């Protein structure tokens, strides 16, 4: 049975002090959250140790927002799997549309990052998704399939999360219709050929649409951006009830 992963990606938000305040509000709100789901937070690198400290003994798991494929070396601005593990990190987001866009990350580089994560017992959250232009040209499925086939090459699907994030829905307030998101997630599962693969949806996820999204048969969680910065709103997402 696929256990949903509810993950919040804080991006370049939250200082250590803000992280402590956020957790002080959030933790009491998940005291009765069912055990049938994982709860994950991806803070900035600077707040990882703070989150680990404040969240010690809680059910909150930690993700990094990226990971490098080398264990050490002259890679300014990067971070290795071992460095993350030292702080209790369990997951690593790779292939998010922002580094794809701003740093021209290729599917090959994303695959290297994901392989490195798995080799060091981290669970990669591999992001895929089409732009508005690609969608309007009818290229969405082709683009996503290429990202899946190249980005997931050589990975163990049992130790992997895929996040379908249509780029046009990230931070825009636009949400992919639940049925369409479910259809794409089902296609991804069929392309990978693993019925147990965990597939998230991401893109303007909020308390108002979480129940409907989690009621879809092929959506196994969400990767939440802006809405995860509000501890009360993210707690509502964590406490979803299938619509």
From Swiss-Prot:
Q: Where is this gene product found?
A: Cytoplasm
Record EC number = 5.3.1.1
Q: Does the keyword Cytoplasm apply?
A: yes
Q: Which GO terms describe its cellular component?
A: cytosol
Return the InterPro entries for the record: Aldolase_TIM, TIM_sf, TrioseP_Isoase_bac/euk, Triosephosphate_isomerase, Triosephosphate_isomerase_AS
Biological process GO terms, please?
gluconeogenesis; glyceraldehyde-3-phosphate biosynthetic process; glycerol catabolic process; glycolytic process
Active-site positions on this chain: 96, 165
Q: Which GO terms describe its molecular function?
A: triose-phosphate isomerase activity
| Major site of localization recorded for this protein | cytoplasm
**Keyword terms, alphabetized:** Cytoplasm, Gluconeogenesis, Glycolysis, Isomerase
Give the catalysed reaction(s), semicolon-separated.
D-glyceraldehyde 3-phosphate = dihydroxyacetone phosphate
Group of enzyme by EC: isomerase
Keyword Cytoplasm carried by entry: yes
- Give me the residues that bind substrate, please: 9-11, 171, 204, 225-226
Which pathway does the record list? Carbohydrate biosynthesis; gluconeogenesis; Carbohydrate degradation; glycolysis; D-glyceraldehyde 3-phosphate from glycerone phosphate: step 1/1
Pfam families, per database record? TIM
Quaternary structure and partners: Homodimer.
**What is the role of the protein in this entry?**
Involved in the gluconeogenesis. Catalyzes stereospecifically the conversion of dihydroxyacetone phosphate (DHAP) to D-glyceraldehyde-3-phosphate (G3P).
- Family annotation (HAMAP family): TIM_B
Q: What family is this protein classified in?
A: Belongs to the triosephosphate isomerase family.
* Name of the protein in its database record: Triosephosphate isomerase
Q: Which organism is it from?
A: Synechococcus sp. (strain WH7803)
Gene name tied to this protein: tpiA
């Amino acid at each position: 049975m696929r256990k949903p992963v509810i993950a919040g990606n804080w991006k370049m938000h939250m200082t250590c002090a803000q992280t402590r305040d956020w957790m002080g509000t959030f933790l009491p709100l998940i005291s009765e959250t069912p055990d049938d789901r994982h709860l994950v937070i991806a803070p900035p690198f600077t707040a990882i140790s703070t989150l680990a400290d404040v969240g010690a003994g809680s059910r909150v798991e930690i993700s990094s927002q990226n990971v490098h494929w080398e264990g050490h070396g002259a890679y300014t601005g990067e971070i290795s799997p071992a460095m993350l593990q030292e702080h209790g990190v369990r997951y690593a987001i790779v292939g998010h549309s922002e580094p794809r866009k701003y740093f021209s990350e290729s599917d090959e580089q994303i695959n290297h990052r994901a392989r490195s994560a798995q080799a060091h017992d981290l669970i990669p959250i591999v992001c895929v998704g089409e732009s508005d232009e690609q969608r309007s040209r009818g290229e969405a499925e082709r683009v996503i399939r290429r990202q899946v086939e190249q980005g997931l090459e050589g990975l163990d699907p049992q130790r992997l999360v895929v996040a379908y994030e249509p780029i046009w829905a990230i931070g825009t307030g636009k949400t992919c219709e639940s049925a369409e998101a479910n259809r794409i997630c089902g296609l991804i599962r069929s392309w990978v050929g693993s019925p147990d693969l965990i597939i998230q949806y991401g893109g303007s996820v909020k308390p108002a649409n979480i129940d409907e999204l989690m009621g879809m048969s092929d959506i196994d969680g969400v990767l939440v951006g802006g809405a995860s910065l509000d501890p009360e709103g993210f707690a509502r997402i964590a406490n979803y009830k299938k619509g």
